[in-house]
């Protein structure tokens, strides 16, 4: 039997939980979260491995369970379906409200599948979110490791890359030395926890490095770092203008690389409570012109904890 969900009702309760998160477990039960995962999984499975979308659209980077900052993004830009969104992954781990964050986003995906797009980040992989907070949160708040496992089943169906207006290639991490054509991205297998090595693992993990030419091993211990020459070569070969990725904290929320052929977007201000970085989102208008909105970290006097 296909799972069904009253998505409006669930969204309303998630939006009313507030920033403390204290009311989540009393207002949303585990079975509802499992159903939300199941329905979201079917939506991801119905769409392509390379999401080919048209502007206008807002592109957002890492969120990392910073629920109040996710809501700031919607408050500033508008809510779907009036505004289209593409998120570049890393919804969970490190922040304090991972479950609210990922479930609200799944609700938007279910309700507005053609207006709200979510790529997978490296933190939507079990080896990572088992360690960096999401597993612990599922266990602490719902006393359930099964809930955590069901989230992994949904994450395994999430797409790894997107293409805006045929000109802006999007992924969480970076490029791959094995990437030669867009058709390779269209044919990426799902469901899958991408193996190492693979194009998939590079899309999740790779980083640009201004001191490197070509490809070198990544100090993260997985995938590669790549130079400006690689970005120029890939843009030429794939006939694209820009690569948009996330995966790294940048002080102003966005940072260009390779003569503006690549941009890093990071959308979690005051990341981990340890950095004083701003966040940013990138708006791509109907004419493929990109502009950035910055979100300053909340003043220290207003922060909790």
Curated annotation (Swiss-Prot):
What is the species listed in this Swiss-Prot or TrEMBL entry?
Answer: Caenorhabditis elegans
Q: Which family does it belong to?
A: Belongs to the PPP phosphatase family.
Q: Where is the active site?
A: 123 (proton donor)
**GO (cellular component) term, any one:** nucleus
* Pfam families on file: Metallophos (PF00149), STPPase_N (PF16891)
Question: What results from gene inactivation?
Answer: No obvious phenotype. Simultaneous RNAi-mediated knockdown of gsp-3 and gsp-4 results in male sterility due to chromosome segregation defects during sperm meiosis. gsp-3 and gsp-4 double mutant hermaphrodites have egg laying defects and no viable progeny. gsp-3, gsp-4 and him-8 triple mutants have incomplete separation of sister chromatids during the second meiotic segregation. Mislocalization of MSP in activated sperm. In addition, have partial reduction in mpk-1 phosphorylation and air-2 association with bivalent chromosomes in the most proximal oocyte in response to MSP.
What reaction is this protein's catalytic activity?
O-phospho-L-seryl-[protein] + H2O = L-seryl-[protein] + phosphate; O-phospho-L-threonyl-[protein] + H2O = L-threonyl-[protein] + phosphate
Subcellular location(s) of the protein? Chromosome; Cell projection, Pseudopodium; Cytoplasm
User: Which tissues show it?
Assistant: Expressed in male germline including spermatocytes, spermatids and spermatozoa.
Binding-site positions, Mn(2+) 1? 62, 64, 90
- Describe the task this protein carries out: Probable phosphatase which plays a redundant role with gsp-4 in spermatogenesis by regulating sister chromatid segregation during meiosis. In addition, involved in sperm motility by controlling the dynamic disassembly of major sperm proteins (MSP) in the spermatozoan pseudopodium.
Q: Which gene encodes it?
A: gsp-4
User: What positions does the entry give for Mn(2+) 2 binding?
Assistant: 90, 122, 172, 247
Keywords recorded for this protein, A-Z: Cell projection, Chromosome, Cytoplasm, Differentiation, Hydrolase, Manganese, Metal-binding, Protein phosphatase, Spermatogenesis
Q: Which GO terms describe its molecular function?
A: metal ion binding; protein serine/threonine phosphatase activity
Protein name, per record: Serine/threonine-protein phosphatase PP1-delta
Q: What is its main location?
A: nucleus
> What is this enzyme's EC?
3.1.3.16
Q: Which GO terms describe its biological process?
A: amoeboid sperm motility; cell differentiation; egg-laying behavior; male meiosis chromosome segregation; regulation of pseudopodium assembly; reproductive process; spermatogenesis
């Amino acid at each position: 039997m296909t799972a069904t969900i009253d998505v409006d009702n669930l969204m309303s309760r998630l939006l009313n939980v507030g920033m403390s998160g204290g009311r989540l477990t009393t207002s949303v039960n585990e079975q509802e979260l499992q159903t939300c995962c199941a329905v979201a999984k079917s939506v991801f499975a119905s769409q392509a491995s390379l999401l080919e979308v048209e502007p206008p659209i807002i592109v957002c980077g890492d969120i990392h369970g910073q629920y109040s900052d996710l809501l700031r993004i919607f408050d500033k830009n508008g809510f779907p379906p009036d505004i289209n969104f593409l998120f570049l992954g890393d919804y969970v781990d490190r922040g304090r409200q991972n479950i609210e964050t990922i479930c609200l986003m799944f609700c938007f995906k279910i309700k507005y599948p053609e207006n709200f797009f979510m790529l997978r980040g490296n933190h939507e992989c079990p080896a990572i979110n088992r360690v960096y907070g999401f597993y612990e949160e599922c266990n602490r708040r719902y006393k359930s490791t099964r809930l955590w496992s069901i989230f992994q089943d949904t994450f395994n169906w999430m797409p790894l890359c997107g293409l805006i207006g045929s000109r802006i290639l999007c992924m969480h991490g970076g490029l791959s030395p094995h990437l030669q054509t867009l058709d390779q991205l269209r044919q990426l297998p799902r469901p899958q926890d991408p193996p190492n090595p693979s194009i998939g693992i590079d899309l999740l993990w790779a980083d640009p490095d201004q001191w490197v030419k070509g490809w070198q091993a990544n100090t993260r211990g997985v995938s590669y770092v790549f130079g400006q020459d690689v970005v120029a070569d890939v843009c030429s070969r794939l006939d694209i203008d820009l690569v948009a990725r996330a995966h790294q904290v940048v002080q102003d929320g966005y940072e260009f690389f390779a003569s503006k052929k690549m941009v890093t977007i990071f959308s979690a201000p005051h990341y981990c409570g340890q950095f004083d970085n701003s966040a940013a989102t990138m708006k791509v208008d109907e004419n493929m012109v990109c502009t950035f909105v910055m979100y300053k970290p909340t003043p220290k006097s207003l922060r909790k904890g």
